[in-house]
Amino acid sequence: MTPVAVTSVAPVDIIHDLKRPKRATESSPITLPDVFSRAVSQYPNHELSFITSSVHDSSMHTTTFTEFNQRVRALAQAMLAWDKPAGAVIVIYLTEHEDNVAAVWACLLSGYVPCLQPALSAQQAHKEGHVAHIKNLFSSATWLTNESGAEQVQSISGLDIHLLSELKASAGVGMDFSAHQPNPDDEAILFLTSGSTGFSKAVVHTHRTILAACHAKGENYGLTSESKIMNWVGFDHVAGSLEMHIAPLLYGASQLHVHVSAILSDPLCFLRLIEENSIQLAFASNFLLAKLTRDLEKRSDLFGKFDLSSIKRINSGGEAVVSSTAQAFARTLKNLAKDGDASFVISAGFGMTETCAGCIYDSINVLETPPSYEFLELGTPVTGCEMRVVNPEDGVTPRPDGESGELQVRGPMVFVRYYNNPEATSSSFVEGGWYRTGDVGIVEKGKMRLSGRIKDTVVVHGVSYGIPELETYLQTVEGVTHSFLAAAPYRAPGQETEGFVVFYSPTFGLDSEDAPVKLYATHCAIRDVSVKLITLPPQQIIPIPINQMERTTLGKLSRARLVNMFKQGELAKHIDRAKELIGIARGASFVALSTETEKTLAGIYAVILDLSVGDMSANDNLFELGGTSIDVIRLKREGESAFDLPEIPTIRILKHPVISNLAKYVDSLVSKDVSEEEYDPIVPLQLTGKKTPIFMVHPGMADVLIFVNLAKYFQNERPFYALRARGFEPGQPFFTTTGEIVSCYTAAVKRTQPHGPYAIAGYSYGGVIAFEIAKRLEAMGDEVKFTGVIDIIAHRARENDLTLGLLTLSHLLGLVSKQDINDLAPSMRPLTRKEQLELVWKLSPPERLVELQLTPEKLKHWVNVSGSLMECGKDYEPASSVSVMDVFYANPSRGSKEAWLHRLKRWTDYSRSEPSYIDVPGHHYTLMDFDHVARFQKIFRARLEARGL
């Protein structure tokens, strides 16, 4: 076979001529300040628009290039008062797009070099280590952040922290300011890598590399001064800052930057913004394509309702794009569009921080031209970029056309070096200036597609997780031979997102008598650690004898070799042996299904959880099998249908998740021999683990379904108990005072865990009750080492707004949207409770009512239970204090996050030690939902560990 030729668009020696796309003016800028200046002078009335994390579409803030220039120049002039030398690195740690854009340009105009800091780790030790590393790397510690960011790094000494709010306050008019004039090869912007193989590296991009990339992108995208783009990627990512801001700015294009929470929380927001703003270019990762498709493909009520004629191209990157997902998304857009003949171009691309984001693209109408492979091809390089695939062993020998190998790229958009790290820089390039991407690619007929990864990360829904960190934790699992474990990224055929496989050598022989029990316990522990760290269990866990785990000459286990053996079927005998032993272990504890009710329930469990009914045991637990809050609702609905019952109370499923126990309860319902159970607020959602239990108090909706998804992350770590309000069951009276609630819950906690130390937390309304329980326990002489207050201010419990309570409950049940809560509240307050319930019922999606098996009477009763709690809190006034407190806060529904944090800090008056205030993803109503619970649990568990629990 003939070696594959290097694929390029233009020779390197004429790249400078190619930096002038036909649609750019002849006076092409050579530095970033030139880009900014030209955009302002040539397109003064073109616009930058922003939607923050705390406002809705109607609160979009728009500013002209001219107005933005004045603000930036004023900030730059104020920055000079810091008296830093030209070229000083300023770490920018901000949340909102508008703040980031202004801060970066102010740094550039004042002669400083901005370094964009992504969200810091919730693990205190990791966060402190990272910040210290950055400080040493730059030989300085100047940070520009907001109050929330300052709060996160306040415990780290030696930092020179400047608040953006104070910088804005000190900024003057800025008219006399003379902007810094850099050279094209000066450092422009630094970007931090994910740190997946250690601490982050700082990627140095000069004015020249950034402008080369932006010219090439603009030419590829067909950008003009009349283009309109929409971006939701964070500004700390090269795709958000370079690809979707500086490149369009180079062409004078107007831009809309939307906080990611606005897109993820409302799938229709993406389409509405395209329609309302005539967006021509947008970005959507494979994860978002899949989510939007799932949420919208069955919304036949919206078919033909959106004017999507403006959108010319949707870029997709960050992870491989599944071809079937892209096609389903395009079909969904076609159905939703007013023009039934509309076509939609999805452009999968390849890029890295080191290449200024995308540098290889393949624009395709996936409905007219069906993709040839499981994942979309990534296409050909942009102008000036070259790519090749080589033998990964030597890094230089070209692979034949159609064969996989290490993907390498070169061109003027490739970074110049890693800041203060010559060793890493040197190892990243080979002779000829080729950059080693770390990805496995195939070039066939001039087009590139990826077939895997060499580098040590796994990408889950577009988020990169470090394989070395995962391996470090897995090495500590009992049953794993230390240093004989490797984890490697792997995407199974048909799987939408990347997964991973774990290879390890057991500390015990697989032929020993106790091997089944030990292997089962080891694999359960490996799954638990994996879910907690990267939100995903392994696709396969493969035990391999030590003498068959070959090492390289450097003493390392070769992930690439192990994955190749796995793909080739060479490890099949080890996989089969593991299945056999685990089957024996399950058989030892296996209890055969003995009654018709158990068999029927087992069938429902199997369908819901996608398991084989033949493997179901009578002692299987819904939650230990991976059941979620949605699965509880499905089990309730399917069970009521199967047994012809008017209702199986949700609380009974929560309290009886084991098949045999639930079967006995169902039998009692069928025979109408149900003995009335005494009210007990404790709902055990997870009972495994030896660490201090966590008690979680319900929010204002009174129920605990919202905690089901969270509880599973504590398996084999600590028991998780939820507290549910009184009044759901027939004959149960409502609570009448806060004191009654606290006395009842405290007694239940003491019955469940007689002695401290205790860990108590509450979500929203429950945060206030948790605070009162902690006070009561301390008054009884017990130690409370953790008091968690989740997103509620100290005096909120007394705010007796029954209308808002009804709407909040309705939102949590999926009956109304988050937007409806604020929109409907004013007009609903004058209505009677009956009229309010009727209005909510009319607004509720019929399919959701069927799914919940909800009737007007059930909704009314639920609302009454919730309302009774609000009535209890109407005279509540916080007093006294607890020894420790952790306050978790999300994005508010209105106003800034800083203002919300300021209100929350009143909790400081009620703690005898300085409380910790912890920023969590999502909004008040979504922080524990499916999209956010994985990140919330990591943050929450980190705080428990920080408190010594």
Curated annotation (Swiss-Prot):
Boundaries of every Carrier domain copy: 592-670
Protein task: Inactive atromentin synthetase homolog. While the invA3 adenylation (A) domain is capable of adenylating 4-hydroxyphenylpyruvate (4-HPP), the invA3 enzyme is inactive because of its non-functional thioesterase (TE) domain.
Task: Using the UniProt annotation, give all residue ranges assigned to the region (Adenylation (A) domain).
Answer: 38-460
Q: Does the keyword Phosphoprotein apply?
A: yes
For this UniProt record, give its keywords in alphabetical order, as a comma-separated list.
Phosphopantetheine, Phosphoprotein, Transferase
InterPro entries listed in its UniProt record: AB_hydrolase_fold, ACP-like_sf, AMP-bd_C_sf, AMP-binding_CS, AMP-dep_synth/lig_dom, ANL_N_sf, ATP-dep_AMP-bd_enzyme, PKS_thioesterase
Q: Where is this region: Thiolation and peptide carrier (T) domain?
A: 597-667
A GO molecular function term, named singly, is: acid-thiol ligase activity
The similarity annotation says: Belongs to the ATP-dependent AMP-binding enzyme family.
Protein's recorded name: Inactive atromentin synthetase invA3
Residues found modified as O-(pantetheine 4'-phosphoryl)serine: S629
Q: How does activity depend on temperature?
A: Optimum temperature is 20 degrees Celsius.
The record ties this protein, via Gene3D superfamilies, to: 3.30.300.30, ACP-like (1.10.1200.10), alpha/beta hydrolase (3.40.50.1820), N-terminal domain of ligase-like (3.40.50.12780)
Q: Does the keyword tRNA processing apply?
A: no
Region annotated Thioesterase (TE) domain, chain positions: 693-934
Name a biological process GO annotation.
biosynthetic process
Describe activity versus pH.
Optimum pH is 6.8.
Report which gene this protein is encoded by. Answer: invA3
